[in-house]
Amino acid sequence: MKRTALAATVVLAFAVPAQAQDKLELKVAEFVGPQHFMTQWLVKWGEKLEKASNGRLAFKHFPGAAMAPAPAHYDLARTGQADMAWFLHGGTPGRFPLTELINLPYMVGSAEIGTKVLNDAGLRAKFLDAEHKGVKVLLLFTHQPGNVHTTKKPIKAADDMKGLRIRFAAPTIRDFVAALGGTPVGVPPTEQVEQLQKGGIDGTFIDYGGAGIAFKMGGVIKYSTEMYSYVTSFGLAMNPETYARLPAELRKLVDESVRGVEKEVGEGWDALDAIGKKALVDAGAQAIRLSKEEDARFRKTGEKVTEAKIKELEGKGLPAKATYEAMKSLSEKHSKGSRSFWTDR
């Protein structure tokens, strides 16, 4: 409640006087349904902006991939089909190679930490913003660390992944699945349930919130192995021409509305973990905790994947090592005082 009040205060502090101008209705594309925390956060965020602008700004939301499938959301904002879009970096593999280093196995322990890392001004200016061509990035964020969920075979050890067809959430997790002996399969988020039901995949890497709430996998998932091994990164992008058309005072209002929200957004995602887990377990799924020995084996494989990815990107002339080291340093910094699923469940 206090965080919501604070966010409202920040927006209202930059409220603009009413002027005799037409209302500007902005289209916002979201690939997850209206029941999800982030979709609801965006709706409330828009309502605050509408109030702070004295009605000069309005927002029309298109949740549930109503405008286009998830992989197309970045381009919806880039081309102006949408004025704003919540997009998934992993939806277009290879397009954001440095940003996606945040998705490496065991990089961050919570959405709060991940969101704080990605919005560090120095990191963005030096490495990340240049990858987001053709849009104005309003906010970068992650979900809480994800797990592997399967339909038939429980995964209790690193060797249990061998031979299974597993949907990956990002290119880095594709490499993780392959290193564990599984077959990585690319499936858009909205098609996971269908592929799980048909047997096209044996399991999927996804966070509890996504599995239990956003994509309603209760009854389909039989086993959830709590690895908390990775986060998926997202962004809120705005069409630059739409932004440029706004009067200066409205541009300022938009800019200020997303400053200092990292903790609020991150904690909101982290809170989905318990809710999503309950939805799956209530529908019959078994939650599996790894032994310390098996957790260490998964982490060792993750280290090898990380080393290989950095070497691969450095070979392409990208500053992967410097980006990774900056992210890791920020992750350690923000771990002090933030929740981590590796230690706090």
Regions found by a protein language model. Give the residues of each.
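Cleavable N-terminal signal peptides
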Residues: 7-8, 18
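Sec/Tat signal peptide C-region and signal peptidase I cleavage site
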Residues: 14-20
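Bacterial N-terminal signal peptides that target proteins for export
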Residues: 1-6
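N-terminal secretory/targeting leader peptides
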Residues: 10, 21-114, 122-345
